[in-house]
Structures are given as structure tokens and as C-alpha cells.
Amino acid sequence: MPPRELSEAEPPPLPASTPPPRRRSAPPELGIKCVLVGDGAVGKSSLIVSYTCNGYPSRYRPTALDTFSVQVLVDGAPVRIELWDTAGQEDFDRLRSLCYPDTDVFLACFSVVQPSSFQNITEKWLPEIRTHNPQAPVLLVGTQADLRDDVNVLIQLDQGGREGPVPEPQAQGLAEKIRACCYLECSALTQKNLKEVFDSAILSAIEHKARLEKKLNAKGVRTLSRCRWKKFFCFV
């Protein structure tokens, strides 16, 4: 019997290649500019540092102009908030006003244990804001709330012949008078209500931008209490 001829086995047919799944393009990042104003030494820098970097400045250093950037998620969409820390001293009035245009939201800050800083909200800060930016929302923020019941602070106020801490109802009344979005008290040291301040600022800015772009639907923006909220980066 003649030997059988061996033939090379044909390779099995390759399975049809399937294209890799397409990655969903990331939603565009929304940018928000938030400017903090108020008298010197009321704790504006401390608010920003405590919120963005989870730290607390060990000593007071007057600010000329600093910016911080944080990325967060709101309803799954990336939002980058730029926090502008301004100087409260008169020497920086001209420099400070340069950052007011294109601001999406202002935090008008006063210390609850410095009545003069509260008085300056209506005498200086609100007029200055509205001169350069008449439409952006304003939040009234009472800082250093942890000192409201501090015995040493109360003694110093009494010995100096100054008024006591600013009553919360009085601050609430001012917020209504100046048509601020809300009034919030917070502490950079203990971080009490700190997140709520910036949550409210971001929400107010988003709604303001939506109104300007005429894209705010009937339901509006969901409250941040229902949103997934994550902080990613801090750039100083």
C-alpha cells in the first residue's frame, strides 16, 4: 500500500474580531469662579485652606491675592471651582477689584466676633461687589463661629468696650436685606458647616450660570444633598 501523503492541516478559521468597546467621552468640565471678600483677619484664607487641603494655618498672614483650584463631582459631572482669596486691606482695593468681573459667586465674609467686620458688609463690601459685578449671587458667611462662646474672646470684647458677638438673627436679617442667597455660619478650625458653605456656593453658581445661558429647566438643579460629591485635587 503506498504511503499516505500528509498534508498540512489548515488552521482553524479565526473568530471574527470584535472592536473594543468605545469609551464614553468624559463630560466637559464646568468651571466656577468663587471670590471671597471681607475685612482682613476674618478668616477667609483659613476657610479656603481648611476646605481644600484639610489643614489650618498656624498664624495669620495678610493676603494680597491667592487662588486655589479644586475639582469636584456634581451629579457625576466634573466641576472645577477656582477660589480667589482677596485682601481686605485698603492698600489692595485696586488690585482686588480686578478679579471681580466674570465671578460666578461671591462669599461676603465677616467674623461673628468682630462686629465692625459685619458692619462693613453693607458699608464697603456689597457696594464694591455690585459696582463691578451687579448680577453674581452673594452668600453671607459668618466665620470663626467656634469663638462665639469662647470665654477669652468674650472678655476681650467686654474689656475693649466693644459689642458682643453678632447675633445670628441679625445676620439672617442682613442676608434677607441684601438679597443674599443665604446666611451660613462656619468654623475653619472645627470645619463645622464648612462643606455646607462651599456646597451652597457651587450650587448657587451653577444655577446662576444656567440662568444666564437660559438652560435652566423647570426642575432646576438637584440639591447637593442628593448628589455624589467628591473632592479630587487641591492646586495652590
From Swiss-Prot:
Record flagged with keyword Nuclease: no
Residues bearing the modification Phosphoserine: 25
Annotated segments matching region Disordered: 1-28
Membrane topology, from the record: Lipid-anchor
Needed cofactors: Mg(2+)
Recorded consequence of changing residue 229 to Y: Loss of subcellular location to plasma and endosomal membrane
Effect of residue 227 to S: No effect on subcellular location
Consequence when changing residue 234 to S: Loss of subcellular location to plasma and endosomal membranes
Effect of residue 40 to V: Constitutively GTP-bound and constitutively active
PROSITE patterns: RHO
Effect the entry attributes to changing residue 228 to Q: Loss of subcellular location to plasma membrane
Keywords: Cell membrane, Endosome, GTP-binding, Lipoprotein, Magnesium, Membrane, Metal-binding, Nucleotide-binding, Palmitate, Phosphoprotein
InterPro entries given in the database record: P-loop_NTPase (IPR027417), Small_GTP-bd (IPR005225), Small_GTPase (IPR001806), Small_GTPase_Rho (IPR003578)
Gene Ontology BP annotations: actin filament organization; endocytosis; establishment of cell polarity; signal transduction; small GTPase-mediated signal transduction
Residue ranges that the Swiss-Prot or TrEMBL entry lists as coiled coil: none
Subcellular location: Cell membrane; Endosome membrane
Any one Gene Ontology cellular component term annotated for this protein: plasma membrane
One GO MF term attached to the UniProt entry: metal ion binding
Tissues with expression: Highly expressed in brain and testis and at lower levels in spleen and lung.
Residues annotated to bind GTP: 38-45, 85-89, 143-146
Impact after mutating residue 230 to Q: Loss of subcellular location to plasma membrane, decreased association with endomembranes
Subunit structure: Interacts with PAK2.
Similarity-based family: Belongs to the small GTPase superfamily. Rho family.
NCBIfam families xrefs: small_GTP (TIGR00231)
Summary of the function given for this chain in its UniProt record: Plays a role in the control of the actin cytoskeleton via activation of the JNK pathway.
Name of protein: Rho-related GTP-binding protein RhoV
Species whose genome carries this gene: Rattus norvegicus (Rat)
Lineage: Eukaryota, Metazoa, Chordata, Craniata, Vertebrata
